[in-house]
C-alpha cells in the first residue's frame, strides 16, 4: 500500500550558510558601514538573532536574511519572527525561531483537510509528522498538491514515499 510522510524540517546547515551569506552582504553594504549589525545562529535552540543599532535596520536585516534563506531553499514562512523588537542599551534585536516539526493544531487541520477531501486515503499523526496511506498513487499525489496549496503558514516536505 503506497504511503508517505508529511514533515516540516529546516536543514540547519543550509540555514547556517544563509546566515553566513547574509553577514557577508551586510559587511559589504554601504548603508551598514560603521554600524554594529550581525546575525547569530544558535543551533541548540534553532534560533537566529538579528542585532543592529536601530529598529529600522533590524527590519532591513530581516529582509536580507529572508532573501538569503530563500536562495538556499528555505522558505520564509519557516522563520517565526516575533512582532516586538527588543531594545537593550544601544542595540535593537529580534530572535527569530526556525520552525521544526508540525504543531498539533496544524496537524489536526491537515488531517481534517485530508478527510474532508473524500479521497480514499488515511492520515495518521505520528509524533511531529503525518503518515498518509492509500491504495492509489494518484490519490497520494492529490493529497500532496492539496497540502502544498493549503495556506497553513508553514512549509511542508514529503518524505518516505513508498509504493
UniProtKB/Swiss-Prot annotation:
InterPro entries attached to this UniProt entry: DUF520, UPF0234-like_C, UPF0234_N, YajQ-like_sf
Signal peptide: none
A GO cellular-component term linked to this record: cytosol
Domain of life of the native organism: Bacteria
Assigned keywords, A-Z: Nucleotide-binding
GO molecular function: nucleotide binding
Function of the molecule: Nucleotide-binding protein.
Family: Belongs to the YajQ family.
Name of the protein in its database record: Nucleotide-binding protein YajQ
Species, as recorded: Shigella dysenteriae serotype 1 (strain Sd197)
Taxonomic lineage of the native organism: Bacteria, Pseudomonadati, Pseudomonadota, Gammaproteobacteria, Enterobacterales
Gene: yajQ
Amino acid at each position: 500500500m503506497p504511503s508517505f510522510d508529511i514533515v516540516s524540517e529546516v536543514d540547519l546547515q543550509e540555514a547556517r550558510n544563509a546566515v553566513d551569506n547574509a553577514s557577508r552582504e551586510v559587511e559589504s553594504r554601504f548603508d551598514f558601514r560603521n554600524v554594529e549589525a550581525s546575525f547569530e545562529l544558535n543551533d541548540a535552540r534553532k534560533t537566529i538573532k538579528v542585532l543592529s543599532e536601530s529598529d529600522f535596520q533590524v527590519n532591513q536585516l530581516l529582509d536580507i536574511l529572508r532573501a538569503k534563506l530563500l536562495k538556499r531553499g528555505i522558505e520564509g514562512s519557516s522563520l517565526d519572527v516575533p512582532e516586538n523588537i527588543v531594545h537593550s542599551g544601544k542595540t535593537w534585536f529580534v530572535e527569530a525561531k526556525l520552525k521544526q516539526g508540525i504543531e498539533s493544531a496544524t496537524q489536526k487541520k491537515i488531517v481534517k483537510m485530508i478527510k474532508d477531501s473524500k479521497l480514499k486515503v488515511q492520515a495518521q499523526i505520528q509524533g511531529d509528522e503525518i503518515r498518509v496511506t492509500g491504495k492509489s498513487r494518484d490519490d497520494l499525489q492529490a493529497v500532496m498538491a492539496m497540502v502544498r496549496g493549503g495556506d497553513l503558514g508553514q512549509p511542508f516536505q514529503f518524505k518516505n514515499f513508498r509504493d
